[in-house]
Amino acid sequence: MSMPFYVAPEQLMKDRADYARKGIARGRALIGAVWEGGIIIVAENPSRSLHKLSEIYDRIAFGGVGKYNEFDQLRVAGIRHADLKGYAYAREDVDARSLANLYAQYLGTVFTHEMKPLEVEILVAELGNGHRESQLFQILYDGTVMDEREFAVLGGDADAIAERFRALYDASGPRERLLQSARDALSGQRPPIGADDLEVVVLEDRGERRCFRRLEVDEVREALGDQPEGSA
């Protein structure tokens, strides 16, 4: 009788982590950053229809990198959770920390117990108010949660991008400068990424309940000082 095939738990976890990291590294990166006027999230994304960034609730935004269908399912689940909690209790009870913990529990369970881990990293951003500071939560493929106060970088080549962005980051400057810094950090040694290949959202307190706003291509182009494609 043949002996059953044995893999050490340490090796199994390492293989799963390597598998997830390789899948995430193939995706284009994003940067989320806090500045004195709110939160900006900038993602390299040439698609106009498949969004990597979206609204979760009044003051909460979501960003995902990696396998699109996997992080989009998590986005939808987060919206449902936030809506139900806000309906059952109060809108003020919906916060990024509890949502990040929910994502972390799910990702950790899948990583530990399922055959294939999810090839995703998630950003949950919440605009602060009088009671809470602005927060950025980065959730990794294995359920690890990192609480960032200034900025977070997700996706392929994240360490190098974070190093470039750290040298440019200025929380007291205007939003346009922060957007330019994010574009420069994402571009690296390549030619600057064009406005058409960037997805940009902001969380800003404009005196309304909803703080999420998606910047149109023309707004991004103007902020970056780029010329429209085809113009002389």
From Swiss-Prot:
GO terms for cellular component: cytoplasm; proteasome core complex, alpha-subunit complex. GO terms for molecular function: threonine-type endopeptidase activity. InterPro entries: Ntn_hydrolases_N, Proteasome_alpha-type, Proteasome_asu_bac, Proteasome_sua/b. SUPFAM superfamilies: N-terminal nucleophile aminohydrolases (Ntn hydrolases) (SSF56235). GO terms for biological process: modification-dependent protein catabolic process; proteasomal protein catabolic process. The formation of the proteasomal ATPase ARC-20S proteasome complex, likely via the docking of the C-termini of ARC into the intersubunit pockets in the alpha-rings, may trigger opening of the gate for substrate entry. Interconversion between the open-gate and close-gate conformations leads to a dynamic regulation of the 20S proteasome proteolysis activity. It comes from the Bacteria. Pathway: Protein degradation; proteasomal Pup-dependent pathway. Keywords: Cytoplasm, Proteasome. It holds the Pfam family Proteasome. Its main location: cytoplasm. HAMAP family: Proteasome_A_B. Belongs to the peptidase T1A family. Component of the proteasome core, a large protease complex with broad specificity involved in protein degradation. The 20S proteasome core is composed of 14 alpha and 14 beta subunits that assemble into four stacked heptameric rings, resulting in a barrel-shaped structure. The two inner rings, each composed of seven catalytic beta subunits, are sandwiched by two outer rings, each composed of seven alpha subunits. The catalytic chamber with the active sites is on the inside of the barrel. Has a gated structure, the ends of the cylinder being occluded by the N-termini of the alpha-subunits. Is capped by the proteasome-associated ATPase, ARC. This is Proteasome subunit alpha. It comes from Acidimicrobium ferrooxidans (strain DSM 10331 / JCM 15462 / NBRC 103882 / ICP). The lineage of its organism: Bacteria, Bacillati, Actinomycetota, Acidimicrobiia, Acidimicrobiales.
